[in-house]
């Protein structure tokens, strides 16, 4: 059965208005999708997670007049519609188009992120199987990519790793597959911990190698490597705490930082770490260094 699919690029502030309006003009389903693989931070319980750049997908019966539906939508919202498109798709094509958004990706020399439904392009490589779920990080966002490439370039054999703000668990699981002995994950969101646990199981990671905690339950033990792909503000305020969680000589990688925020974040860590040059990609940066 074919469907009319309408896609709109919205902000989080527009989400409720457009969801209600689309349902009123006849949409049979409304779905929110992350436009940039931007991690979610501190979503409210029992609410729909939203991203800074969100795509809203609405499905209508195939015989719906797209122009009339969009005109009605504009009247209901009382504003000019944001960037949008409309097309008729088949059921099978709709599912395939969603899956086709997630192709295997290589990071560094060894590491591949592979959707669980896709064959690994290089079976002998380090392949991390991932199902994009609540969009806690799939590798497509520059901050995630910067961290994955850094991990791929490290000697992690026998290391203990702390993933602070673990989201999907992608960084911790990558570290384990790259040779780390254990990775600890912590996140403020129980949904993120569930996603991490599911993805660890998908990669045959035993639970004892990847314990997961809410921040208030995190044991105080020093890691050989700490990665934190969160936001600049929390990274600055957490700098003293994170410094205590890394042993002397241990390694640090921070991201989730806009280029214009890089110097401020680096300054917060400069007293405790010997910092490397800041790595930049598409307006985002990664800060790395060693604990003094």
Swiss-Prot record:
Keyword ATP-binding: no
Binding-site residues, S-adenosyl-L-methionine: 144, 165, 187, 229
Pfam families: PrmA
Disulfide pattern: none
The reaction(s) this protein catalyses: L-lysyl-[protein] + 3 S-adenosyl-L-methionine = N(6),N(6),N(6)-trimethyl-L-lysyl-[protein] + 3 S-adenosyl-L-homocysteine + 3 H(+)
Superkingdom of origin organism: Bacteria
Subcellular location: Cytoplasm
EC number(s) recorded for this UniProt protein: 2.1.1.-
Uppermost EC category: transferase
Keyword Nucleus in record: no
Subcellular location, principal: cytoplasm
UniProt keyword terms in alphabetical order: Cytoplasm, Methyltransferase, S-adenosyl-L-methionine, Transferase
Entry GO terms, CC: cytosol
Alphabetized PANTHER family for the sequence: ELECTRON TRANSFER FLAVOPROTEIN BETA SUBUNIT LYSINE METHYLTRANSFERASE
Physiological role: Methylates ribosomal protein L11.
Protein name: Ribosomal protein L11 methyltransferase
Lineage, uppermost ranks: Bacteria, Pseudomonadati, Pseudomonadota, Gammaproteobacteria, Pseudomonadales
């Amino acid at each position: 059965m074919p469907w009319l699919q309408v896609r709109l690029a919205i902000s989080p502030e527009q989400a409720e208005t457009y969801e209600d309006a689309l349902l009123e003009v006849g949409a049979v389903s409304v779905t929110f999708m992350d436009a940039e693989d931007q991690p979610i931070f501190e979503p409210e319980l029992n609410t729909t997670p939203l991203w800074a750049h969100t795509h809203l997908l609405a499905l209508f019966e195939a015989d719906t007049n797209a122009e009339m539906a969009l005109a009605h939508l504009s009247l209901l919202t009382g504003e000019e519609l944001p960037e949008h498109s409309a097309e008729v798709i088949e059921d099978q094509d709709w599912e395939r188009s969603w899956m086709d958004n997630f192709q295997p990706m290589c990071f560094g020399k060894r590491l591949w992120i592979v959707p669980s439904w896709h064959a690994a392009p290089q079976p002998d490589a380090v392949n991390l199987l991932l199902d994009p779920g609540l969009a806690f990080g799939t590798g497509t966002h520059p901050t995630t990519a910067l961290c994955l490439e850094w991990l791929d370039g490290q000697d992690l054999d026998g290391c203990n790793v702390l993933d602070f703000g673990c989201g999907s668990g992608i960084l911790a699981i990558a570290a384990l597959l790259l040779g780390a002995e254990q990775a600890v994950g912590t996140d403020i969101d129980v949904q993120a911990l569930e996603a991490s646990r599911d993805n660890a199981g998908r990669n045959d990671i035993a639970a004892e190698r990847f314990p997961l905690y809410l921040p208030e339950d995190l044991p105080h033990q020093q890691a050989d490597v700490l990665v934190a792909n969160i936001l600049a503000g929390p990274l600055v305020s957490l700098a003293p705490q994170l410094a205590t969680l890394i042993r002397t000589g241990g390694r640090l990688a921070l991201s989730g930082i806009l280029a214009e925020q890089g110097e401020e974040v680096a300054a917060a860590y400069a007293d405790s770490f010997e910092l490397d040059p800041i790595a930049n990609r598409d307006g985002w940066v990664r800060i790395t260094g060693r604990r003094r």
